[in-house]
Amino acid sequence: MTDVLASAERVLRDGIGLTEPELRAVLDVDDDSLPRLLDLAHRVRRRWCGPGVEIEGIVSVKTGGCPEDCHFCSQSGRFDSPVRSAWLDIPNLVTAAEQTAATGATEFCIVAAVRGPDDRLMRQVRAAVRAIREAVDINISCSLGILTPDQAAELAEIGVHRYNHNLETARSYFPSVVTTHTWEERWQTLQLVRAAGMEVCCGGILGMGESLDQRAEFAAQLADLDPDEVPLNFLDPRPGTPFADLPVVSVAEALRAAAMFRLALPRTILRFAGGREITLGDAGTRDALRGGVNGLIVGNYLTTLGRDPAADLALLAELGEPIRRSELQALSQAL
């Protein structure tokens, strides 16, 4: 335990993430030492990311009917899931962006359940980005699956600020989660995103049956990628999917994982996303915001309910954590 805390102190001092063996040791920290680990992760975040928590809202432009077989996902058309295919029109997307901005969020992410965007989806996204930019001062992100070079360039050109494409899990465990495409295909899309000039958002889901060794492997692989944002999800088992009967990650396990990712990526936005309500609850979320996490998705997720945004904003105020503003919002308020 002393070695783990000494390693964390080194990250605080130098801003260089832990090695994979060191990350693995973080996951063995006992419950009695967990508060000290979380405090160190929080201090690392404050030193290397600064104060404040970034708020984001997400909306699904195309829900369900996905041809891929991601075993955690109720939107796959291959599983006996209650989710059915549907599209959201432009006025509703603009309304969702306005509601997100009203919470103080800096990011609004347009998500589609697809392998990758076809011409119809790209037309819809172009129109949505144009309409939202005319109506709302908020950064627009997208999560549309696997991209071609031309698609990545077009998204950057129309003003997409950040692109999300999760690696989901360690490279060694990925074939147990998805069989219809490869980890390497996802990695390649992330390289296209960066080359096009967009910020890279890449994280994954914990609790899909991976080992602790593979969690540390995943954190080290994300550190190699060095994304601008890492969304950290916890499996919320969905009926009809292959992972429907997996157990939910415990609070202590989730907090150790959050601290590990912060110590792997001292300068990255580490955002709690899907599953935090069922895994952490209010008390666990509070501990995590004092344990390395500096981003939240507010409101509902793609197919599951989230927390009331007002409750998250009240929690941030209670903790004395300001909401981070984007350059776009700062410029708008200055004018």
From Swiss-Prot:
What reaction gets catalysed by this protein? Answer: (4R,5S)-dethiobiotin + (sulfur carrier)-SH + 2 reduced [2Fe-2S]-[ferredoxin] + 2 S-adenosyl-L-methionine = (sulfur carrier)-H + biotin + 2 5'-deoxyadenosine + 2 L-methionine + 2 oxidized [2Fe-2S]-[ferredoxin]
**Which GO-annotated molecular functions does the record name?**
2 iron, 2 sulfur cluster binding; 4 iron, 4 sulfur cluster binding; biotin synthase activity; iron ion binding
Where the record annotates domain Radical SAM core, the positions are 53-276
The cofactor(s) it depends on are: [4Fe-4S] cluster; [2Fe-2S] cluster
Keywords for the protein's UniProt record, in alphabetical order: 2Fe-2S, 4Fe-4S, Biotin biosynthesis, Iron, Iron-sulfur, Metal-binding, S-adenosyl-L-methionine, Transferase
Which superkingdom heads the taxonomic lineage of this protein's source?
Answer: Bacteria
What EC number(s) does this enzyme carry? Answer: 2.8.1.6
Give binding positions for [2Fe-2S] cluster: 109, 142, 201, 271
A Gene Ontology biological process in which this protein takes part is: biotin biosynthetic process
InterPro entries, sorted: Aldolase_TIM, BATS_dom, Biotin_synth/BioAB, Biotin_synthase, Elp3/MiaA/NifB-like_rSAM, rSAM
Biological or metabolic pathway of the protein: Cofactor biosynthesis; biotin biosynthesis; biotin from 7,8-diaminononanoate: step 2/2
* UniProt: [4Fe-4S] cluster binding residues: 66, 70, 73
* Entry note: cofactor: Binds 1 [4Fe-4S] cluster. The cluster is coordinated with 3 cysteines and an exchangeable S-adenosyl-L-methionine. Binds 1 [2Fe-2S] cluster. The cluster is coordinated with 3 cysteines and 1 arginine.
Q: What does this protein do?
A: Catalyzes the conversion of dethiobiotin (DTB) to biotin by the insertion of a sulfur atom into dethiobiotin via a radical-based mechanism.
Recorded family membership: Belongs to the radical SAM superfamily. Biotin synthase family.
Subunit-structure text: Homodimer.
Q: Which PANTHER family match?
A: BIOTIN SYNTHASE, BIOTIN SYNTHASE, MITOCHONDRIAL
Name of this chain's protein: Biotin synthase
Q: Which organism is it from?
A: Acidothermus cellulolyticus (strain ATCC 43068 / DSM 8971 / 11B)
Q: Which gene name belongs to this protein?
A: bioB
